[in-house]
Amino acid sequence: MKKQLIIIAILFFITLSTAFAQNAGEFVVPLTDPNKRGKLKAHLNYGSITIKGSPRKDVLVKYKAIAEGEEDDDDRDEEKRLKPLPRINTKTNSGSDGKNAGLKKISGGTMDLEVTENDNSVRVNSDSWSNKLKLEIELPSGFDLNVSTYNDGDLVISNIQGELEINNYNGEINAENISGSVVATTYNGEIKVTFDKVTEATPMSFSTFNGDIDLTFPASLKATFKMKTEQGEILSGFDMAMIKSGPIQKKDTKSGTYKVVIDEWVKGEINGGGPEFSIKNYNGDIIIRKK
């Protein structure tokens, strides 16, 4: 069995190496047991990831290298985000003699994309800082996700039934038709999530520094919200029973130090309350919509 896995891995690597020469392509990753739930862990240092749930029984991965100066189809209004982090320069300086004048760049650097599957756990990873990638992944709807990207790319997810952990740094997070729970964090970009159904008794968390947090929940939602924004408004389509929060008194038993903390969080209950949903923003609004 081990020998068979090694052979499969070698063939898979050869296939990818050949395909990468074209800078774009796709391949199918079979699951160990298509009838069981799966988990996807996907990470890019530089680029965007789109994930779509479907009735399929395997995982389809499409990849494309975004050339320098080429716009990603998922790029948003650049005025809403900070300037992307600088790329690592992999090109040789041609100097002022113009020795490369008239030549076309065919490729530079490596795509560095690794894909593995073990017992329905699929891992898609690229640690490249010099080549921007666009990944499109189609998989069974019943998957748990751990997805992250760092620089100049958005995370777009749809039609998933499971637990989602979504992390970005310089880009947006957009998830729709979600049944389950979500923990979403980005630094420079908005967060927009639409739920068809939420997992009962499961806390959630949403956080960004620069951009709106826009969440849509079913009308039957029962939750306790803990919300905070420094430079924005909090808006709700639900009737929310507000919870008063006064100064919090604390005393360190070891040092004897006594202090009073003013709680700046806004707290409220929907439909009698439930698990805590923490929503933190700095420069943007918090919007809670009723579906």
Where are these regions (language model features)?
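Short loop/beta submotifs within extracellular cysteine-rich repeat domains
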Residues: 49, 191, 234-235, 286-288
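Extended hydrophobic-aromatic, low-complexity segments
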Residues: 215-216, 236-237, 287-291
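Bacterial Sec-dependent N-terminal signal peptides
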Residues: 1-27
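Extended beta-solenoid/beta-helix repeat architectures
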Residues: 130, 138-203, 207-210, 216-221, ...
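Short, low-complexity, Pro/Ser/Thr/Gly-rich segments in the mature regions of secreted, periplasmic
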Residues: 276-291
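Acidic (Asp/Glu) and glycine-rich low-complexity loops/linkers
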Residues: 21-44, 48-148, 165, 182-183, ...
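Extended lipid/amphipathic-ligand handling interfaces
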Residues: 47, 195, 213, 284
